[in-house]
Structure formats: structure tokens, C-alpha cells
């Protein structure tokens, strides 16, 4: 039986190249469909694949066809209803066979098509979802770059310590050397052994010639055996080299209001925003730490599960979260070595006397050390004192941004607005 092994990189996905070309060509339509689809998903289903529909008109190809007017004779095979000069009635409702409601304008060609629907994978979905997004003001910390190295494999070397010896590569070199050094002698030995076999069976016996052949065979075998099995020339060691790694370590503080004024719908929208943020960070950057802080009258640093699923609630003192963030930064994240970011989500309801304190903490302690601070207010009500205090900060600090979310449909556009990749001129 003959076996055919497909060793192509795209062996199981032979249309991958065509698929990628299609995604590039219709990226605008696909991204529009994705931005509409994300609002229909549950909080826990944000990162799966998606069925994308594109209007047929957007994917139509240019083609040659007959012009309108003129007289033409056509033959329709299998026709048993009409004869020459009969007139064919126009189909009812325009004859569109597509997915329209049938209440629009009549179709001039009597035909229609459904929208083109196809499935994109999780990776394709996330790539399109977070395309052109980046953490603002992300900088390389140069003084850490001088001291921070990462070890990489760099082939093999003939010198090294015994711990790094490559046994397989050394034995391969040994076999190659012994084969090269003894190949001629082995061919000569094989010829002498064949000659000895012939003489030993010949009549009359040729004792002197047989003795000579035996001596030569013994000498050749001794020469072959004197070739060492392993030599220092054969030894190979795994080679490692240290390459400087630019340090772009970042930490994101997620501050979520869980006070009693935050109803379940508002909390769900806040969680949806933070899930988008988490997926964006984990997919785009290698080493980004996330610090989760929940607050009502008191703030507490929690893990990921408690941040999204805890039912604890209470009053509202926003400054408690800002104070805790300041303490964590001073304790664990030196601003000279870390890119510090923060995303705060709240419904804007805060104890009136606490809002000026929030302004003071941000202006004097946090905003001078963070790369970017974003505030998202989720409410349908009029803005309160916290929003007005933060407006003063936005006018003073370039690294402070604030956005307003009213409904679930606003989450993704607001997210893209906050983390839109900056141009070179803006970042400068």
C-alpha cells in the first residue's frame, strides 16, 4: 500500500490564503458586522468566533454582460409553456428571491440574493476586534533596558561547559568522522576478506598467500579499531546568548464601583467593558499585570474571579479606591520601571463631599505617575459632582480621558475611542 503524507503548512486548511485575502479585502464590512454583533453577546461569550454577514452588493464582482435594449433571440431548454412572440409577465413583488421584506422597490432584474454569511474563528475575531488599538503613551524604560537580558538559543559551539553538551549532535559528529576516516580501509578490508574466502576454497591450498592475507586483514582491523570512538573534535555544546530586551512592563488598575446605586444592568455593562479590556491586554501585550479593585464605602484588592462575580455591595466613597491604588503603586510599582494605567468605571453617584477629595488625589498623586487614566461613567441620568470634578482634570491633564456610556451599544465604540492607536505626531 502506498502512503501519501501531506507536509504542507496549510495541509488541513488549503484555502487559508484565499480566506486571508478575503478578510483583507472586505475588512471594513466585516468590522462593521463585528461591532454590531458584540453588543448581542453575553458577558462570558465575548471571545468566541462569530458568524459575519455581508450585503451581497458589497462583494459583487465586475463582469461583462449584454447591454440593455436591442432585439435578441434566446432559446430556453425545457420550455413547454411558451411559444415564439409570447410575453412573459413580470414576477409579483419584484421577483426578489432574497431575504428582504418584499415591501421595497420592484427589482428591475426580477432576482435577489441573501446576504453572504460566513464564520470567522476566535483568533480572526479578536484580531479584528482590537485592530488599531494600543495602550497610550507606552514607553520603553531605557535604564531597565541596560540591565535586562533574555537568554536565547543560538545554535551549537565547539567549546562549553559539560552541562551544556549536546549528546546527539556530538554522536552525529563522531559517526561522521569515523565513517570518513575508515571508509577506504573498510573497502580494502572487504576486498581482502573476499580474496581470502576464494583462496581458502581453492585447490591446491595456497598457504603462504593465505597467511599473507590474514596478516593484512589483521593490520587493517587494528587500524580501524585505533580510530577513537569519540574525540574532542566531535564535541558540540548548546550555545546560549543574552540579548538585551527593552522593558515595556505595564500594569493596569481596574477600579469598579459596586455600590448599591449600581444596578445589575449597570454592573453588567461595566463587566463587559473590563472583559474587553482584559482580552485586549492579554492578546496584544506579553507582560501586563492587572490589579483588580472593587469599592463601595471601602476598597479592596481582589482576584479576577471575585472582581467579576462577588455580590458584595454598600455605600459609595470613590476616594477609597483611589487611595488604595496609590498605596499599591508605592508598594509594588515604581513609576520609573513600570507603565501604569488605570480604568475606572462608575455610575457617577458619589458622596458629595468625597468628589473634591477624588480630584485632589488624582491631581496630586496618581495622574503625575500614570501613563493614562480613563474614567467611564455608566448612567442614563444627568452627570453629578464626580463628573464635574473630573472635567476639570481632563482640561488640565493630557493623560486623563473620560467617556459616557448610556446603553450597551455604546461600550465597544467607547472602548475603541479610549484606546485608539495614536499617530506618531500625537505620541510625540
From Swiss-Prot:
Signal peptide as annotated in the record: none
InterPro entries, from UniProt? UPF0229 (IPR006698)
Tell me the protein's name.
Answer: UPF0229 protein YeaH
Q: Where is this region: Disordered?
A: 78-111
Task: Please give the superkingdom of this protein's source.
Answer: Bacteria
Q: Which residues cross the membrane?
A: none
Species the sequence originates in: Salmonella typhimurium (strain LT2 / SGSC1412 / ATCC 700720)
Give the family from UniProt. Answer: Belongs to the UPF0229 family.
Question: Ranges of Gly residues compositional bias?
Answer: 92-103
Q: Which gene name belongs to this protein? A: yeaH
Q: Where in the sequence does UniProt note compositional bias of the Basic and acidic residues kind? A: 78-90
Amino acid at each position: 500500500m502506498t502512503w501519501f503524507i501531506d507536509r504542507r503548512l496549510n495541509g488541513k486548511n488549503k484555502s487559508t490564503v484565499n480566506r486571508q485575502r478575503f478578510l483583507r479585502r472586505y475588512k471594513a464590512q466585516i468590522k462593521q458586522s463585528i461591532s454590531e454583533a458584540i453588543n448581542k453577546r453575553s458577558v462570558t461569550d465575548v471571545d468566541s468566533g462569530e458568524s459575519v454577514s455581508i450585503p451581497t452588493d458589497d462583494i459583487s464582482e465586475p463582469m461583462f454582460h449584454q447591454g440593455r435594449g436591442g432585439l435578441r433571440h434566446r432559446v430556453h431548454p425545457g420550455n413547454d409553456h411558451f411559444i415564439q412572440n409570447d410575453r412573459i409577465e413580470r414576477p409579483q413583488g419584484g421577483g426578489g428571491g432574497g431575504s428582504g421584506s418584499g415591501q421595497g422597490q420592484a427589482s428591475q432584474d426580477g432576482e435577489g440574493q441573501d446576504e453572504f454569511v460566513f464564520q470567522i474563528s476566535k483568533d480572526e475575531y479578536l484580531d479584528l476586534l482590537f485592530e488599531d488599538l494600543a495602550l497610550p503613551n507606552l514607553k520603553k524604560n531605557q535604564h531597565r533596558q541596560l540591565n535586562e537580558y533574555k537568554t536565547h538559543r543560538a545554535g551549537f559551539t565547539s567549546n562549553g561547559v559539560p552541562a551544556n553538551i549536546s549528546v546527539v549532535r556530538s554522536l552525529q559528529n563522531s559517526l561522521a568522522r569515523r565513517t570518513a576516516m575508515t571508509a577506504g580501509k573498510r573497502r580494502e578490508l572487504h576486498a581482502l576478506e573476499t580474496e581470502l574466502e576464494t583462496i581458502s576454497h581453492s585447490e591446491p591450498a595456497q598457504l603462504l598467500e593465505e597467511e599473507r592475507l590474514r596478516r593484512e586483514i589483521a593490520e587493517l582491523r587494528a587500524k580501524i579499531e585505533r580510530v577513537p570512538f569519540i574525540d574532542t573534535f566531535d564535541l558540540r555544546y548548546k550555545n546560549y546568548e543574552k540579548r538585551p530586551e527593552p522593558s515595556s512592563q505595564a500594569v493596569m488598575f481596574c477600579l469598579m464601583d459596586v455600590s448599591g446605586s449600581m444596578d445589575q444592568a449597570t454592573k453588567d455593562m461595566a463587566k463587559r467593558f473590563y472583559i474587553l479590556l482584559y482580552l485586549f491586554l492579554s492578546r496584544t501585550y506579553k507582560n501586563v499585570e492587572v490589579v483588580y479593585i472593587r469599592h463601595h464605602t471601602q476598597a479592596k484588592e481582589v482576584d479576577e474571579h471575585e472582581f467579576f462575580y462577588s455580590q458584595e455591595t454598600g455605600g459609595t466613597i470613590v476616594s477609597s479606591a483611589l487611595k488604595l491604588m496609590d498605596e499599591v503603586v508605592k508598594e509594588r510599582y515604581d513609576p520609573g520601571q513600570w507603565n501604569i494605567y488605570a480604568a475606572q468605571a462608575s455610575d457617577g453617584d458619589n458622596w458629595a463631599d468625597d468628589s473634591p477629595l477624588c480630584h485632589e488625589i488624582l491631581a496630586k498623586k496618581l495622574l503625575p505617575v500614570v501613563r493614562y487614566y480613563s474614567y467611564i461613567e455608566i448612567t442614563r441620568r444627568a452627570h453629578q459632582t464626580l463628573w464635574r470634578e473630573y472635567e476639570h482634570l481632563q482640561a488640565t491633564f493630557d493623560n486623563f480621558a473620560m467617556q459616557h456610556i448610556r446603553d450597551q451599544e455604546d461600550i465597544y465604540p467607547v472602548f475603541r475611542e479610549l484606546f485608539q492607536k495614536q499617530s506618531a505626531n500625537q505620541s510625540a
